[in-house]
Amino acid sequence: MRFVFISFLYFLCFSSFIHSVELEELSYGDHVKQKIDFYPGSSDKVLVWIHGGGWIFSGKRETRWIRRLERYFKVNEELNIFSIGYRYGRNTAPQAADDTLCAYKFISEEVKKRGLSEDDVTLMGLSAGGHLACLLYT
């Protein structure tokens, strides 16, 4: 019983608060994975986040990616976060890169429409997402 109580306390203290903030899901294509989660922040700064997963699994809402964001940024206190979803899996090699480019173009328009800073946009990803971010940057 004590273990259950401690586990519950851990959950309350360390559960991801980004999930408690209302997010907006945006579509940049027709495929079910061509979605962007937008988490509004209090400033005009923008973070474009690309999840990892070896190009074959995972997703933009997977807890481990969200927790890594929370560890390094004041998530939803300051930054406006656009978390890109993309097609992945076997035999989808060019699709992830194509989707990321398409999503970034879509986000650029959203930044303008929402009156966010076009000069203060940070692009980052982890693992496969880091690779896709580098492809966008070049």
Question: What are the residue ranges of the model-derived segments?
Answer:
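N-terminal cap/lid segment of alpha/beta-hydrolase-fold proteins
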Residues: H19-S42
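Short beta-strand element of the alpha/beta-hydrolase
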Residues: D44-G54
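Serine-hydrolase catalytic-loop signature spanning alpha/beta hydrolases and amidase-signature enzymes
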Residues: G54-F57, R61-E62, I81, F106
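Short amphipathic alpha-helix adjacent to the substrate-entry channel of hydrolases
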Residues: R61-F82
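Alpha/beta-hydrolase active-site loop
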Residues: T92-V111
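Gly/Ser-rich "nucleophile elbow"/oxyanion-hole loop immediately N-terminal to the catalytic nucleophile
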Residues: S108-L123
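Gly/Ala-rich beta-loop-alpha elbow adjacent to hydrolase catalytic centers
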Residues: G125, G129, A133
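Conserved small/polar residues in nucleotide/adenosyl-binding loops
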Residues: Y137-T138
